[in-house]
């Protein structure tokens, strides 16, 4: 049975990495958590770069009709900045342990 060794840990990515390392097991993790995580022992990335693993982030201002406490003007300003050339540059330059964490692709 393929799922015989499957474990659902019900925790965040950092805790999941800790459990996988403690069990000497495999897990799927996002790159930024993997890079930021300090206790990797001898574990390493064994597979990466396949398009189905692409973990894209998006930004969507929330409608004040649905969420009355939303600050729409501020949300639009943040969205526009993140999608701007300067925002995309800042995202691309954000690094941890000398590794780029995010790869902006706004069009």
Regions found by a protein language model. Name each.
Residues 1-107:
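Exported/periplasmic ABC-transporter solute-binding proteins
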């Amino acid at each position: 049975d393929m799922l015989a060794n499957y474990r659902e840990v019900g925790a965040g990515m950092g805790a999941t990495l800790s459990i996988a390392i403690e069990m000497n097991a495999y897990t799927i993790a996002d790159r930024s958590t993997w890079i930021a995580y300090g206790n990797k022992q001898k574990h390493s990335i064994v597979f990466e770069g396949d398009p189905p693993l692409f973990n894209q982030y998006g930004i969507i201002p929330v409608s004040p009709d649905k969420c009355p406490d939303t600050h729409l003007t501020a949300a639009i300003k943040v969205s526009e900045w993140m999608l701007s050339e300067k925002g995309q540059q800042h995202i691309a330059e954000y690094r941890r342990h000398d590794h780029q964490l995010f790869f902006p692709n706004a069009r």
